[in-house]
Amino acid sequence: MSKPIQIERGVKYRDADKMALIPVRTVVTERQELLRKPEWMKIKLPADSSRIQGIKAAMRKNGLHSVCEEASCPNLAECFNHGTATFMILGAICTRRCPFCDVAHGRPLTPDANEPEKLAQTIHDMGLRYVVITSVDRDDLRDGGAQHFADCISAIRRKNPHIRIETLVPDFRGRMDRALEILTATPPDVFNHNLENVPRVYRQVRPGANYEWSLKLLENFKNAHPDITTKSGLMVGLGETNAEIVEVMRDLRRHGVTMLTLGQYLQPSRHHLPVQRYVSPDEFDEMKAEAMAMGFTHAACGPFVRSSYHADLQAKGIEVK
């Protein structure tokens, strides 16, 4: 029996070390077992990377993090090249250890009290008009990090009065009422929380999370703020069926959600959950048609779609795929 990993505060645990801490074991994928990527999943990188390096430098200078880098998003080059980024607050170490996600797990450091002001200044310097703020899960905090979200929203608006803010929040497990009460004073323009996948595979995909709890979070926020858009998204290719995806879409509509994102899951490393299927662009188009027929005001459905992918265009109702 191998010796358990001693988790040290502030240390990032990734790949095999992270997966060793998950109660639901994942099997290392051998190279010959990997599904071959279809042509539509191949990305052409931009020739000029100066804008990309500029954004990375701005992040490093102010001690900030982007989910684009921490989660190894396939759209990083495209988004950074267009001068957009999704900021990740509350550090870069997550208290959860989901086997689909490339964000590091461990014992996080105390939140940086100066982060709200540094974030607001960076956004001002970048000249952004629409920004997405997300975070790692912080189960170690009594409010799940809600007050830090509120402080960031307030600081951003003070420095950038004309900006629109979308928050992509964790599930605030065991702290929903407290978290939503805190956010009532400074709500975002768009409230996003991802279901990630269908309930049948939750134990494998999101250990520690609960499908019904996440739906309730979205519904409770909407009930408290009926004029604010709520949004959610799923990754596909983790063993779910198209019929199950459609049923999740119905659940989201029943809980007041009007914006949807569907994108292809990509395995960050061979230690993570393997891709079980690649969903074709035609299938994504069919899912988008289903979503619009259900009453979603906007549905971004495509292989490279992520919840914050061209989020400004999504909020304007412009097609993204």
Swiss-Prot record:
GO terms for molecular function: 4 iron, 4 sulfur cluster binding; lipoate synthase activity; metal ion binding. CDD domains: Radical_SAM (cd01335). Pathway: Protein modification; protein lipoylation via endogenous pathway; protein N(6)-(lipoyl)lysine from octanoyl-[acyl-carrier-protein]: step 2/2. Binds 2 [4Fe-4S] clusters per subunit. One cluster is coordinated with 3 cysteines and an exchangeable S-adenosyl-L-methionine. Keywords: 4Fe-4S, Cytoplasm, Iron, Iron-sulfur, Metal-binding, S-adenosyl-L-methionine, Transferase. GO terms for cellular component: cytoplasm. It catalyses: [[Fe-S] cluster scaffold protein carrying a second [4Fe-4S](2+) cluster] + N(6)-octanoyl-L-lysyl-[protein] + 2 oxidized [2Fe-2S]-[ferredoxin] + 2 S-adenosyl-L-methionine + 4 H(+) = [[Fe-S] cluster scaffold protein] + N(6)-[(R)-dihydrolipoyl]-L-lysyl-[protein] + 4 Fe(3+) + 2 hydrogen sulfide + 2 5'-deoxyadenosine + 2 L-methionine + 2 reduced [2Fe-2S]-[ferredoxin]. Its cofactor is [4Fe-4S] cluster. Residues 80-297 form the Radical SAM core domain. It is an enzyme of class 2 (transferase). Its main location: cytoplasm. Pfam families: LIAS_N (PF16881), Radical_SAM (PF04055). This is Lipoyl synthase. It comes from Pectobacterium atrosepticum (strain SCRI 1043 / ATCC BAA-672).
